[in-house]
Amino acid sequence: MRAAGLGLGIGLLLLAALAGPGGSAEQGGVPAKKLRMAYATGPLLKFQICVSUGYRRVFEEYMRVISQRYPDIRIEGENYLPQPIYRHIASFLSVFKLVLIGLIIVGKDPFAFFGMQAPSIWQWGQENKVYACMMVFFLSNMIENQCMSTGAFEITLNDVPVWSKLESGHLPSMQQLVQILDNEMKLNVHMESMPHHRS
């Protein structure tokens, strides 16, 4: 009975590890794919967002409203990646947790390899394998998510920054964003209509 429970717990952990936040292409160490690109001929509005912070839905809502109001604007969105050191830590943890879970399951003592005595927490893990595996998995996932979360919601129009959550500390309201875009579009039209003087 205990072996069946252990097998079920291990199966659930492996399934969650494959589908967990550290393993997804959107948040892992691999560069994130584009969230969406609307094919149009006008200016490019680019969003760089923290997907692991839950901003994808906000981006999709903004994109829907903006594409209705400004049909000529091209809209791109991508994951704003954290600094390389945090990406490497998250990648290391995603592999390390699987190795550690494997060692707990097979009962192999890694401390004996280094000629050290196993600490009491390792002994506890061997006596409570399911709980130990779950604890390692969820604790590691929590740290991975923290490493990958940037809190970013950066917006540029033709590579000119128009909003930065990292600087302002909050997301723009839809009204703010529309007002910013209106001002930028009017400025662009005004600049294009000015006569070019030759030197």
From Swiss-Prot:
Record Gene3D superfamilies: Glutaredoxin
Post-translational changes noted in the entry: May contain a selenide-sulfide bond between Cys-50 and Sec-53. This bond is speculated to serve as redox-active pair.
Topological type in the membrane: Single-pass membrane protein
Keywords from the UniProt entry: Endoplasmic reticulum, Membrane, NADP, Oxidoreductase, Redox-active center, Selenocysteine, Signal, Transmembrane, Transmembrane helix
Listed transmembrane segments: 95-115
Superkingdom in the source lineage: Eukaryota
Principal cellular location given in the protein's record: endoplasmic reticulum
GO molecular function: thioredoxin-disulfide reductase (NADPH) activity
Cross-link (Cysteinyl-selenocysteine (Cys-Sec)): 50-53
A Pfam short name: Rdx
Signal peptide: 1-24
SUPFAM superfamilies: Thioredoxin-like
InterPro entries: Selenoprotein_Rdx-typ, Selenoprotein_T, Thioredoxin-like_sf
EC number: 1.8.1.9
Record-level GO cellular component terms: endoplasmic reticulum; endoplasmic reticulum membrane
Family of the protein in this entry: Belongs to the SelWTH family. Selenoprotein T subfamily.
NCBIfam families hit by this protein: CXXU_selWTH
PANTHER family: SELENOPROTEIN T, THIOREDOXIN REDUCTASE-LIKE SELENOPROTEIN T
Protein name (record): Thioredoxin reductase-like selenoprotein T
Organism (species): Gallus gallus
Gene from which the chain derives: SELENOT
